[in-house]
A protein has these predicted regions:
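Electropositive polyanion-binding surfaces
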Residues: 2-40, 50-257
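Acidic, low-complexity central loop/insert segments
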Residues: 44-48
Length: 257
């Protein structure tokens, strides 16, 4: 990617745009507009007391619960894993790991195991179904799940044991086709939370932590991206930076598994 393309891609991110200062009057106008949108699209901001109570209860004693889960899950806590998200992300629901082996690549995509904590017969489940998704507005987020849950036990924060669903893929070194696919429940321990800009800096700095891992991830992701284009896939953003390419291609590969 050229320096001009990199600059253009970076300018489109929250990190590249920098902070914006507004007056108190403008802040009030934004709040009023936000409330109008909530009413127009029937978006609920506050959670019912029962949902909040369930969320608090599910975050009690989670470390002991995770230890108990090790008996029934793959223990991947020693596997290097990391998350890459926007600078303003509040929950980290996916992480990746990658390794080059003699006979190809091995890629892991880890997804936070939300369903372990949110069951179909719970008030949290009913509320999540009603909301449908998390709504992101400028400087404001309306969560699908209570932040007590979404930003703690359901978030793959660094240096904490977390429950996950893992897609482990062995890829052919030439065609990048699947040699093996294994999907299982796991316990992981993310090594670091990166922003997209931090990922770019790690790629540029050979001495930075996770440089080798991110470089390998981009090498693989770039090849998968080019392969998709050759296969006729629609590419909406050809100037996407390396960090976004890594996450996008790894998630697409996991979705195909």
């Amino acid at each position: 990617m050229t320096s001009d393309s990199e600059a253009q891609a970076q300018a489109g991110t929250a990190e590249g745009q920098g902070p914006v200062e507004i007056s108190p009057a403008e802040a009030r106008q934004l709040q009023e507009k936000r409330e109008e949108l909530f009413e127009e699209f029937e978006i609920r901001d506050a959670f019912p007391p029962e949902v909040l109570r369930e969320a608090r209860d599910r975050t009690d004693g989670v470390q002991a619960e995770i230890q108990d889960e090790l008996e029934n899950r793959q223990d991947l806590r020693d596997l290097t894993a990391w998350t890459t998200d926007p600078i303003d992300a509040q929950d980290f629901d996916d992480a990746i790991s990658v390794r080059e082996e003699e006979d190809g690549y091995r890629l892991w995509v880890h997804i936070a195991d939300v369903t372990h904590y949110v069951h179909p017969d719970s008030a949290m489940w009913a509320e999540a179904v009603e909301r449908g998704n998390t709504v992101y507005l400028p400087a404001y987020t309306i969560h699908m799940l209570p932040p007590t849950l979404a930003e703690t036990v359901c978030s793959l924060v660094p240096e904490e044991d977390r429950l996950a669903h893992t897609v482990e893929m062995e890829l052919d070194p030439e065609t990048l086709s699947f040699e093996t696919i294994d999907i299982y429940k796991s316990v992981i321990r993310s090594d670091e939370r990166l922003t997209y800009s931090q990922c770019e800096h790690r790629l540029d700095d050979p001495d930075a932590p996770l440089h080798e891992e991110n470089s390998l991830a981009f090498e693989l992701a770039d090849r998968m991206h080019e392969q998709r284009k050759e296969d006729g896939s629609l590419v909406l953003n050809p100037r996407r930076d390396r960090a976004h390419t890594i996450i996008e291609e790894c998630m697409l590969k996991a979705n195909k598994a």
